[in-house]
Amino acid sequence: MLNRRSNALITLSRTKFFPITTVAYYHRRLPNQQRRAVSTSPKKEIKSLEDLANLDSLDGVDTELIRDLINEHTTKLNIKKELDMLKKFSQEEESGHEIPVKRFIRPLWMFILMGSSVYLLLHFSWWKLEHEERESQLKKEVEILEHQLNELIVQDKTHNTSRGKGSNESTHMKPWYRRWFW
């Protein structure tokens, strides 16, 4: 967060681990605008450090002007460095708040595999119990049907023995084609 006041640039950055407050002062008028350079030659005016570097010697240059230019350039570099540092901190803070999806992929796969394994195990046991129940029901039905069949066979034998003596002789006396059709 940047706040500008009349003569200060205040930058604030607060994170979990360390709060940072930075104050950088700047001048409304830069030092080279406040004073005109006093140079050895009247043709050249010194406005920046580059102009000082182009001079052959610094003998006739005011030391206050040199100090102001150096301080101005240092202040600019410090402000740039602090802003870069704050941008870096803010980017780290933003990236720290983002939860990477990669953190959840493996636990999600583990959950899916464990869940499907438990589901298959429970489904298999349920199917087996249902199969055993159905098998016992079918065995009971088979026993009931066998019992009914045995009763019918016994009834048929008793019924055949009671009417069988007279009717067997009469059926054997008939020709074969009459036994089938009448």
Curated annotation (Swiss-Prot):
Amino-acid biosynthesis in keyword set: no
Key words of the record: Chaperone, Coiled coil, Membrane, Mitochondrion, Mitochondrion inner membrane, Transit peptide, Transmembrane, Transmembrane helix
GO cellular component, one term: mitochondrial inner membrane
Ranges facing Mitochondrial intermembrane side: 128-182
Coiled-coil segments: 128-158
Family designation: Belongs to the INA17 family.
Name listed for the protein in its UniProt record: Inner membrane assembly complex subunit 17
Species assigned in the record: Saccharomyces cerevisiae (strain JAY291) (Baker's yeast)
Originating gene: INA17
